[in-house]
């Protein structure tokens, strides 16, 4: 861990020094290049921003996406899948975003639209300024992605704060994003959406592995940070068990997550947009990954979710079936409580013929 830390700090330091020498021209060129990549990908139908399915020719990746509006007004969830991310055949970007507050649907869409391009720009810039040595290749690649995700989230949040047409003072969004590059998945999580992997156990059964932490305010490290910034964490009397973040004096905003983009009314009191960045090596046993908003996980367990997806006859309809099952579970388990927006992305790693039989 110490070795990785020093490597990560070295990459950050080295890149900052080199970047400072020619910051304006390099940044402008990188932005233009990534914008052009996004336009080309959209033309070739390699970017999906609505419910549906994407499976590019020659790719083992198949992504299924579905989102359903809840009972609280406009759907504030949104998602994106970008196959051939950055013009790399072995890369795919997936993200799911859960907005909240009066402007939440605008905030989630803004972050969804800006994050993939910003990340690609930061990754390419960092990569071009870094020499990858063979003995530490994997560690260095992770360090580069981690640095790129951190810089991206910082930039996206700052851009959102100064956006002229979106009021994100009392509104925000979570963001759960992954990049698959070859046989490695890089995961960045801001908020309480969740990534769950379906993998085949030694006994041959399909089991769920949770890859992310639900960043709730009552997690010890999150609560400590919030209280250290003079914020408060407590449950309302009519919501026992639902911990929320509050300002020092006012009874607002009452966020049910401890990390989010936007929500500047509480940013000085412990809410952060810093992602937790992790990686996972994909093996032949790993079948698919589910990214879903808390509307799914509030009523469906990790194991139930992978069982639903794996038993869906058509992979292209896997996300839709998962969401439909979550709706049924919500009506059964939370009768009388307004249903949340419910959204999911299911990314399958292998063609059905190459998957091990259970």
From Swiss-Prot:
Q: Which residue ranges traverse the bilayer?
A: none
Listed under GO biological process in this entry are: negative regulation of growth; protein dephosphorylation; regulation of microtubule binding; response to water deprivation
Listed under GO cellular component are: plasma membrane
Reported EC number(s) for this entry are 3.1.3.16
Q: Which Gene3D superfamilies match?
A: PPM-type phosphatase domain (3.60.40.10)
Enzyme class, top EC level, equals hydrolase
Q: Name one Pfam family in it.
A: PP2C
Which residues does Mn(2+) 2 bind? 98, 294, 340
Domain PPM-type phosphatase: residue ranges = 62-349
Mind listing the UniProt keywords for this protein, alphabetically?
Hydrolase, Magnesium, Manganese, Metal-binding, Protein phosphatase
Q: Which superkingdom does the taxonomy of this entry point to?
A: Eukaryota
Residue positions annotated to bind Mn(2+) 1 are 98-99
Listed InterPro entries: PP2C, PPM-type-like_dom_sf, PPM-type_phosphatase-like_dom
Concerning PROSITE patterns, the annotation shows: PPM_2
Q: Which reaction does it catalyse?
A: O-phospho-L-seryl-[protein] + H2O = L-seryl-[protein] + phosphate; O-phospho-L-threonyl-[protein] + H2O = L-threonyl-[protein] + phosphate
SUPFAM superfamilies associated with the record: PP2C-like
Q: What protein family does this chain belong to?
A: Belongs to the PP2C family.
Matching entries from PANTHER family are given as: PROTEIN PHOSPHATASE
Stated name of the protein: Probable protein phosphatase 2C 34
Q: What is the lineage of its organism?
A: Eukaryota, Viridiplantae, Streptophyta, Embryophyta, Tracheophyta
